């Protein structure tokens, strides 16, 4: 089983062409729904009493929501604005609300999960919750600038507790205080994790494992509407694919990254979660074949 832990949110996203207000979002939401095309994930998250029923139904359609807690108060909210090129996002407002006092725990039915993804979340909570699983075969985490700047030591401690780290290029540099991505990855692996995947947005990603470097290009798109959740969709597809195969060989991890690139490309083609919610498995397989043709020579 795969368990995803992190945030479920109500997002306000402002792009040059459209503004979405209070739509379903959150790192764990994107990651878990992306993973759901490969396996049935369990979600550990919290929402408030204002969380719309229609969004709860969406989560229930794709995920096991036994670990979704409902607390009195408002749901975690995020408000962000993209520049005209959709390459820079400015955070306008973050309201933790119920997420700020949520005390997460792993439901009994999730404790035997052999795959665990710790989506962008408080590193202290992540490090604590990974210990509540009985026997994890493969664990992975993500982090962002906010946690690196406010809890860097805890981020490093979290990295020691997982098998793989997924992080974007600028945050890898910020975390390690290095300018070269190879040096970044080596330093992160030196902290105890086995695999490092550095996301480079539209330019794909780099996988590092021991002395191996595996670069993968992003899937080329003519139209991008909303980059929100692309990195979370990438990571969710990665661990969802691995959980479906129940294998973590380096060859399977490479394949999982291809699926990650593909799922990230679907996420950015529409606004919010629509790129994922409109998907069929046949769409994914078709794009993977297109990707294979694109990179073959």
Give the residues covered by each predicted segment:
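Extreme N-terminal starter segment of soluble prokaryotic enzymes
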Residues: 1-3
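Conserved N-terminal subdomain of the carbohydrate kinase-like
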Residues: 10-22, 37-118, 130-136, 285-297
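Alpha-helix C-terminal capping segments
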Residues: 30-41, 241-245
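Short beta-strand scaffold segments in enzyme catalytic cores
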Residues: 33, 78-81, 204-208
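Short, conserved phosphate/pyrophosphate- and ester-handling motifs at nucleotide-, phospho-/glycolipid
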Residues: 35, 168, 231
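A short acidic, amphipathic alpha-helical/loop segment
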Residues: 55, 125-132, 153-157, 183
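Conserved phosphate/ATP/ADP-binding segment of small-molecule kinases
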Residues: 137, 145-215
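Conserved phosphate-binding/catalytic region of the ribokinase-like
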Residues: 181-297
């Amino acid at each position: 089983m795969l368990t995803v832990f992190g945030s479920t949110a109500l997002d306000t996203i402002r792009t040059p062409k459209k503004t979405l207000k209070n739509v379903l979002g959150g790192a764990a939401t994107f990651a878990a729904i992306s993973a759901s095309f490969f396996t049935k994930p369990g979600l550990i998250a919290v929402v408030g009493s204002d969380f719309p029923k229609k969004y709860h139904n969406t989560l229930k359609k794709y995920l096991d929501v036994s670990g979704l807690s409902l607390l009195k108060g408002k749901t975690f909210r995020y408000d962000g604005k993209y520049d005209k090129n959709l390459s820079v996002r400015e955070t306008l407002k973050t309201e933790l609300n119920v997420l700020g006092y949520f005390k997460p725990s792993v439901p009994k039915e999730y404790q035997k999960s052999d795959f665990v993804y710790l989506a962008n979340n408080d590193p202290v909570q992540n490090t604590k919750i990974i210990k509540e699983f009985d026997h994890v075969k493969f664990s992975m985490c993500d982090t962002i600038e906010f946690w690196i700047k406010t809890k860097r030591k805890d981020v490093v401690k979290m990295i020691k507790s997982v098998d793989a780290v997924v992080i974007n290029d600028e945050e890898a540099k910020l975390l390690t205080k290095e300018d070269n991505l190879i040096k970044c990855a080596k330093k992160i692996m030196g902290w105890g994790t086995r695999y490092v995947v550095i996301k480079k947005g539209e330019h794909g990603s780099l996988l590092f494992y021991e002395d191996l470097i595996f670069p993968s290009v992003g899937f080329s798109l003519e139209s991008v509407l909303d980059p929100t959740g692309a990195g979370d969709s990438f990571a969710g597809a990665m661990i969802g694919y691995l959980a479906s195969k129940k294998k973590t060989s380096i060859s399977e991890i490479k394949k999982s990254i291809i699926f990650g690139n593909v799922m990230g490309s679907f996420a950015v083609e529409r606004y919010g979660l629509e790129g994922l919610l409109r998907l069929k498995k046949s769409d994914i397989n078709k794009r993977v074949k297109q990707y294979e043709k694109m990179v073959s020579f």
